[in-house]
Design a protein with these regions (language model features):
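Glycoside hydrolase catalytic-domain context in secreted enzymes
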Residues: 1-344
Length: 344
């Protein structure tokens, strides 16, 4: 299973995980999400991989209090904004898995919500439900929905959460002994999981996806499609006639900023490893025939780059680079892997 795509709605730029999503529009999110799921799961005799629609539901920040936050949404907001993408992925793309969110939704824990589970049933969901990691533990530690881990495990399992990412389900047998769950509850969850494994061909002697070599995964054709996707996805918010650069007038470009020559910034989070990385600086150096000046300018989140230096130890370098260039290319921002979950 790949715990992706993230089809939450992104409408506040302060949400540190917004870059994982498809943006603020429910329709566009649904369309992109469906294509992603179909690409992951394939259409062969066995399922290529199991995709996962997350985080169900109303998970769009604030990130710092996600473990105890109660998202209050009207029926109108649920139907028009927060649920359409999930519904489309279930009904049209046949997504194999759905992941519950950390937060509560109108008072109910998302991983044990009668309302949300009812929606999945209404849509004809035929896969398995998984909690976000340690979300079920939040029931008793942060949300106050239960008194202890045994009750939390029982609440989630009986509601329809088949898999617990975390350790709370080690208490399922204790819940069975206390009469909080039944053997049928456990059997039903196991059936859902085994059904997915069968669809993935895990019990077959051999499938068409067992031995795909890296030279196929990273072939020229695939790279061309990735490049086309990147080019068509870019949005130029403001130009004022600067681009494209006039080669006859521009002799020197200053590339400034802590993200200019960073390979980490290209990765995002929950990332794989590419066979090639080209930083912003390297890309400009490769394409521009004139002079390229580089200055780090500052640290991403510290007041200085060098440990023994005074604050702002790279400012003068950046100013000098800018003063000696015809065009300045500034790369600032944050690195996804270091975005603090304790912010908004």
């Amino acid at each position: 299973t790949f715990w992706s795509p993230n089809v939450n709605i992104f409408r506040d730029p302060r949400w540190g995980r917004g870059h994982e999503t498809y943006g603020e529009d429910p329709f566009l999110t649904a369309e992109n999400g469906k294509a992603y799921v179909r690409g992951l799961q394939g259409d062969g005799e066995v399922m290529k991989t199991a995709a996962c629609a997350k985080h169900f539901a109303v998970h769009s920040g604030p990130e710092s209090i996600r473990h105890e936050f109660n998202a209050e949404a009207t029926q109108k907001d649920m139907e028009e904004t927060y649920l359409p993408a999930f519904e489309a992925l279930v009904k049209e793309a046949k997504v194999e898995s759905v992941m519950g969110a950390y937060n509560r939704v109108n008072g109910e824990g998302a991983c044990a919500s009668k309302f949300l589970m009812g929606k999945l049933s209404e849509w004809g969901f035929d896969g398995y439900f998984v909690s976000d990691c340690w979300a079920i533990r939040d029931f008793h530690e942060h949300h106050g929905l239960t008194k202890n881990a045994v009750e939390s495990a029982a609440l989630a399992l009986t509601a329809g959460c088949d898999v617990n990412c975390g350790c709370t389900y080690v208490n399922v047998l204790a819940a069975l002994d206390e009469g909080l769950v039944t053997k049928e509850d456990i059997r039903k969850a196991c059936v859902h999981l085994m059904r997915t494994r069968i669809r993935l061909g895990m019990f077959d002697d051999k499938t068409e996806f067992d031995d795909i070599p890296y030279n196929i995964v990273s072939c020229v054709e695939h790279k061309k499609v990735s490049l086309e996707c990147a080019e068509k996805s870019m949005v130029l918010l403001k130009n004022n006639g600067i681009l494209p650069l006039d080669k006859n007038k521009v002799n020197t470009i200053a590339v400034i900023g802590p993200n200019s020559n960073s390979r980490i910034v290209l990765e995002g989070n929950y990332n794989g490893t590419a066979d090639r990385y080209i930083t912003f600086l390297e890309g400009i150096q490769n394409r521009f025939e004139g002079r390229v000046i580089y200055a780090e300018g500052c640290h991403l989140y510290k007041q200085k780059v060098s440990g023994l230096a005074m604050p702002g130890d790279r400012y003068a370098e950046a100013m000098a680079a800018a003063e000696n260039a015809d065009v300045e290319n500034l790369k600032i921002g944050e690195i996804a892997s270091q975005l603090s979950l304790q912010r908004f």
